[in-house]
Amino acid sequence: MKHLKGLLLPALLALASSAAAKDPLVETTPFKNELVNLMYFDDSGVALVQELDNGKIFRSHDAGKGWKEIKNVKGLGIMKSPYDNKVALILGEKKHWITFDQGENWDSFETELPPSPQSPVGWHAQDNKKILLNEIENCFTAPCLGRTYYTTDGFKTDPKVLVDNRRMCQWAKASERFLQGMDKHDDRILCITRGKYSDRSKDFRLLMSDNFFKETEEPVMSSGRTVQGMANMAAVKGYIVAAAKAEHSSELALYVTQDTDSWHHALFGDHKIEEDAYTILESTNYSIQVDVMTSKYVTMGNLYTSNSNGTYFTKNVEHTNRNEAGYVDFEKIANIQGVVLVNTVDNYKEVEKSGQSKKLKSRISFDDGRSFEKLTVKGKDGELHLHSVTNLHNSGRVFSSPAPGIVMGVGNTGEFLGKYTDGDLYVSDDAGLTWELALEEAHKYEFGDQGSVLVAVFDEGDTDEIRYSFKHGRKDSWQKIKLDYKIRARELTTLPDSTSLKFIVYASRKKDGGGREHVIVHLDFSDILKKCGDSDFDDEWSVRKDADGDPSCVMGHKQLFRRRKWDAECSIGELFKDPVPKFKPCDCDKFRDYECDFNFTPAGEGKEKKCEPGESFSLPKGACDGDAKSYKGSSGWRKIPGNQCKGETERDKQVERECKDAERPRPKTDKITSEITKFKGSNFMEQYYLERNTQSDGKDNERDKDETVVMLTDERTAYITHDHGKKWKKAVDDEIVRIYPHQYETNNVYFLTASKKVYYSKDRGLHDSINSFEAPVMPNTDMLPIMQFHPKQKDWIIWLGGKNCEKVGNKDCHTVAYVSQKNGEDSSWESLVPFVKKCAFVWREAGRSVKEEQVFCEQHTNEEKNAPLELISSDDWFKKKDVKFKSVVEFATMSEFIIVATKAEDNTLRLDASLDAHTFAEAKFPPKFFDIHQTAYTVLDSSTHAVFLHVTVNPQRDQEYGSIIKSNSNGTSYVMSLAAVNRNSEGYVDFEKMQGLEGVAVANVVVNVDEVNKGSKKKKQSRITHNDGADWEPLQAPEKDSDDKPYDCDVANREKCGLHIHGYTERADPREMYSSPTAVGLMLAVGNVGPELSTFGEANTFMTTDAGITWKEIKKGTYAWEFGDQGSVIVIVRRGEDTDHVYYSTDSGAKWDLYQFADHKMRVEAITTVPSDTSLNFLLWGKDSKELFAVNLDFSGLPEFQKECKLDEHDPTKGDYDLWSPQHPLQQDEPECLFGHVAQYHRKKRDVKCRNGQRIDQMHDIARNCSCTRRDYECAYNYERDSSGDCVLVPGLSLPDPSKVCSNKNVKEYYANTRFRKIPLSTCQGGTEYDKTGDVHPCPGFEEDFQKNHGVGGFTLFLAIVLPFAAAGGVGYWVWRNWDGKFGRIRLGEPGGGSAFDSDAPWVRWPIAAVSGLVAVIAALPLVVGSVWRWVAGRMGGGGGAGGYAGLGGSGYGRAYTSRSSFARGRGEYSVVDPDEGELLGDEESDEDV
């Protein structure tokens, strides 16, 4: 139990009580160890407590007077049901206990793994036998996912597994007010689980089930679509709130439901909600209250309150005080509606600017937060300030208890809140309206007997006194209990409802002989006071706030309590009976009792607030029919549901509204529009899309409608547009030399000057959000990447600058790497290492278990400028460094593996790979590669659980070609996939994966290798694979061209008359791709039909809609293309000659229409749209005589796109979509079986007129797995395919001894050699399993284990085989981008938004679900939760990354594109990732580098 050490005692969460008189009874019980989890069962005298060091649990049945150990039970923590006062759980490592009679009897049950450290138990609010139990999450491969069990009989029978791969689960009825009194959804459970086919956090889904996940439903949000990227959820009063996080953004979308059937998108006006930056607070029965952090580095927030259905949030308080853990100084006074205490930061400007320490002031509201005022002390001028939730000194609520109107706190008078130890104890008996000094010095305090007794104990050191008052704590009413010893109080508590006259003080005292012992002091005031009579009560006490002394109206009524008079020295003595208020209705008030009606949006605040029709506003039935000019409709206001005010106001009445304002304004035109903007300059240097969070449906959310592009011209002027190029403005008024968008946070962008000044925005340049910081030194001048970003910690930046480089030619000029953990702000730069070529953060979401601080750098040996490079590593910002490799040419980090190219003594390259950034293993290449002088590698792709690597065979200029080899699923053993693949001198390879589909790729091969080796020109043909490189074949040419004429060769003979298309090596713009991730199965290309690929000038434009099986020629000549609205519209524009028009198709290329965008011809260089291809806007970039231009094309006005497409996942073909399954052209039997399964994708029906809108999840389902056939296998290591397609041993090789793997002591068995290995993507089952043809044998010494364990599970195999070989697994979607001209084409993987943190398990310390009114801290639970159990070492975690078209080698600077893709061609799930993946690892020109 050592792992429980260091947990603070704070335990009970909403406790309270009191004490007083002649001689209260005092009983002391000593304990041997420190205590935690002191808690009462509600409405009883039964308490539990736990010893920290050994987990022993003790029970008291008489309110802490006597204690007995519960035999044979030792736990990690205690969880008490918040809804049943007889039920509690003791959680052990694997054995747990439950009681249904307040701990008199305990029944045990077991789980396979220990409980989750974060949220181990889910209680059902209405059935005490229904419980969820969450096991500890597996964070080994990240993001952390775990198993949840359920019971419906209170663990009388063994718990059953609910779901295996969940982020979190809860009952729908997880809070008392949710569906209260409704007889539905009793068994409904909501879980956030792994994606349908992915473990990445961006794919997490919210699923519901009414039959324990035998069947599930994914709820649709207010957009009518399901939402991926679900991060968290919490039950708050009558609401459930779920948070979704978009990829490449820390911004969250909040969704709220009151019944789990319909969900609303919560809108916060202009404010964005970010992960780890908001706290859902204790809310009212009719609204949700959320505190939103205003700055990443300053713990301050703004408090927002929702309307009654949780949709619109308005700001109530600015600059609330928060702490790092997400706790907020906010408390609703218990039992009294409308009274709220907060602490705000007075010097917020100085705190934000210079990090000055905070000056706090306390404020109180009596109208539910609509207005706030100072705290005043009776008879004194000046303000009172109190310590609140961020500085807890006791369990339970901070200020209040169910005792009506009696409030206490520790604080001081003066200008600001001082130190706790300088504070005194203050009390108010009018709910905070006025205060008086109760006791000098800081004290812990409690309320008892509905406020008749107040107890306090000194809290600044040891004391031998306990103080109590029977007169509401008035100054001279405090009496003393003298103890025989001095104690240091740790906790003071009583019954949660504060009705008891018995209290418990948990404390420590000095022991004889040194040291301290722990004691529980029981205080009993029962026999001191007489029982109160009727005359001792005030029957209608209330918070008298109005100027005339009338009770305040909250929610349309006054609240009245029967309360003991302050000077009546008697006890109420109604044990376990909570004070219940009476209500009197008030007259309705138009400001206080109303909110905006449905489909109306609030604008303005306070008395200026208006309710205006929202975008989804629609006319009442029959209104505006015929010639009607007006209609009667809602005033825009409605009475807040649940409000009990009487009478009517003008806001209840319908108003006359004009018909012309009623409907949502249609687009100004039903045609395509274009807008041309001219710019000075000769070239566009860089352009980037900053794509908004596509997760939020944005229907009513103005801040989510922008389509932002930033652009730099060669005049060093940066421009920005928020409407996709209709209007442009200068981004900053300064000379800009580079633009860096943040790879992992699409809201962030950086504008670099030639000096140290850097401009940046964290909100896509919206809302005047462009600020600046000073870099430590000017940018480097060596054409090296200047900025590197962290996949998870979005404010961590590595800056590669130049020192002593101000003067050109200075010999002392060299590179230095710096790091900032504060986005470069507040002079936060630390020096890392000098003389470096590149540095990169190593942490990734997918399973690389390293510290977030881990950095790899390439540094010149001995810090000498021209010395060879070393690969060095550090996880403490290079206070210590570890040299991993010498003579390094290049390294690349992908999502799951790191590869390093080093130069051997014979000048050949060697490739090493690592899974964990610590242990590296040399890659095993096909045997005949050992004869090749390996001069360059290009990493092509690893999106299909295997790495594709191009190894250069002929490096001679203009004659380059090489072989594509493909790895096994852990990236270390390679086999031949395709020989003689074309490459150019910059390391680009003619190879491209089809986006959005598994296993389809196109490559160009050199067919006259022998002649080329003798100096001849290359002849090229195109090849396509439909099974991830196992089989390649020529492309099938169409029978006729676009003029309906046959080609002049026999297209049936594909070898001599195939379709050949131009690839990367010849593209004028390497940013273009054949396909789009959101237009599944569609590809466009330029090429020709014939025996070989001809010149670009002779090419025409072709298209396929079935993933490359059949093609058709769509236009003569070469065109550039873009996909819009996920393939709903395709736009093509003439390339390489002047034009004034584009063609577009809205039916997947069946028909093409012309649109003229200019009155004269201009030269168009490129066409672009948002990376996810979800927009109906496009940009043409080009030159018109001496000016640059950008043309916006807007297709959103077309009638075809006026309604949104309907998609029902349960009946997908019912609406506007079909299901489409890709096929393999060579498979006669079951051609739709690809990779062992039939995949089904959503595709919009060709003839429907609607827009896709919000991005849809293209993959619908894996319909079924297929039986294994030869197509599911490729040749194993040491084997190659012969002309008949069989796998034969490479000539001249003898087979290695398979038992040699037994030399590794972790390996217990081996397979005999087989000729085949399964394609890593394949999920086939049964049939003919070609890779199992070799028998499995035990290693010597493991025969017994072999017999016992045969068929060991995948996870064990993973540990036994992958880790011992330090394998590198290449998984991740890759897209590309181009960085710094030098690095050429980069395909990069996908950053994630995961997060991990080490923390003490909060439930071990705090057994109830709220800390001083804190109901749920969504932001303080990042998306991935780290483990605290002692047996799970280190930081497990999620985040992101992936690999790219990393040319591995070479120094040649390549194309003159100075951008990363110039258009962050991240395209949805394929996204911009590591700049380091863009480099050629080794090259014939690279000798000078080492």
Swiss-Prot record:
Q: Where is it predominantly found?
A: Golgi
Please give the superkingdom of this protein's source.
Eukaryota
- Annotated glycan sites: N285, N309, N970, N1265
Q: Which UniProt keywords apply?
A: Glycoprotein, Golgi apparatus, Membrane, Protein transport, Receptor, Repeat, Signal, Transmembrane, Transmembrane helix, Transport
Q: Note the segments forming the BNR repeats.
A: 97-107, 364-374, 426-436, 719-730, 1102-1112, 1143-1153
Subcellular localization, as worded in the UniProt entry? Golgi apparatus, trans-Golgi network membrane; Prevacuolar compartment membrane
> How is this protein positioned relative to the membrane?
Multi-pass membrane protein
Q: Which InterPro entries has this protein been placed in?
A: Sortilin_C, Sortilin_N, VPS10, VPS10-sortilin, WD40/YVTN_repeat-like_dom_sf
Residues spanning the membrane: 1355-1375, 1406-1426
GO BP terms in the entry: Golgi to endosome transport; Golgi to vacuole transport; protein targeting to vacuole
Q: SUPFAM superfamilies of this UniProt entry?
A: Oligoxyloglucan reducing end-specific cellobiohydrolase (SSF110296)
Q: Where is this region: Disordered?
A: 1016-1048, 1465-1490
Q: Where is the composition biased (Acidic residues)?
A: 1474-1490
This molecule's function is given as: Functions as a sorting receptor in the Golgi compartment required for the intracellular sorting and delivery of soluble vacuolar proteins, like carboxypeptidase Y (CPY) and proteinase A. Executes multiple rounds of sorting by cycling between the late Golgi and a prevacuolar endosome-like compartment.
PANTHER family with a match to the protein in the record: SORTILIN RELATED (PTHR12106), SORTILIN-RELATED RECEPTOR (PTHR12106:SF27)
Q: What is this protein called?
A: Vacuolar protein sorting/targeting protein 10
User: Native species of this protein?
Assistant: Pyrenophora teres f. teres (strain 0-1)
